[in-house]
């Protein structure tokens, strides 16, 4: 038998913090991947890849697809990046893979890294050069 609802609404008040926590968790997850993408936007070609994907799909582009487009762009332009930009990109990817946020790790792994690998796999020498740039967690994935 369920407990009767308190006249003063205290049970409802007790439920509110749980709902608020869910909103906070969802907001943090969204901020985590958006912050990650914002970090990559410091590289012009990745900003253009993001803009092109959003132009094609709209602002509500599936996140994994967006990350896949970013991975494809990294692979296609790998040799054009300066050593500093390359290090920045792969350090950012590794930070994403080491993040506490499970959603961010999933987007980086199943979107960005899988797309990066699919593109690089066609050229063994490129794949080898990229693997040298990957951090331990990214390489293990």
What are the roles of these predicted feature ranges?
Residues 63-72:
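HEAT-repeat alpha-solenoid elements in large eukaryotic scaffold proteins
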């Amino acid at each position: 038998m369920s407990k009767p609802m308190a006249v003063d609404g205290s049970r409802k008040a007790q439920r509110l913090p749980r709902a608020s926590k869910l909103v906070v968790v969802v907001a943090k997850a969204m901020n985590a991947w958006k912050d990650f993408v914002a970090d990559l936007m410091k590289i012009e070609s990745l900003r253009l890849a993001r803009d092109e994907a959003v132009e094609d799909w709209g602002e509500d582009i599936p996140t994994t697809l967006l990350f896949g487009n970013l991975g494809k762009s990294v692979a296609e332009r790998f040799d054009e990046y300066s050593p500093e930009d390359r290090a920045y990109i792969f350090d950012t990817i590794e930070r994403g893979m080491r993040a506490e946020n499970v959603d961010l790790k999933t987007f980086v792994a199943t979107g960005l890294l899988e797309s990066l690998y699919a593109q690089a796999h066609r050229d063994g020498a490129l794949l080898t050069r990229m693997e040298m740039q990957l951090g331990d967690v990214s390489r293990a994935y």
